[in-house]
Amino acid sequence: MSMTSDDIIYVVFALGLVVSFGLGAITAGVFR
């Protein structure tokens, strides 16, 4: 499985969304 620069950018973008959603959920839970 060879990864091109586009694949890496897509993976980083996806991870960024997951992390941002995770932090948002944690923050909402803390301040609920």
UniProtKB/Swiss-Prot annotation:
Its main location: virion. Pfam families: Inovirus_G7P_2. It is found in: Virion; Host membrane. The chain crosses the membrane at residues 8-28. The keyword Membrane applies. It is a single-pass membrane protein. May initiate with G9P the virion concomitant assembly-budding process, by interacting with the packaging signal of the viral genome. The assembly-budding takes place at the host inner membrane. In turn, G7P and G9P are present at the end of the filamentous virion that emerges first from the bacterial host. Belongs to the inovirus G7P protein family. This is Tail virion protein G7P.
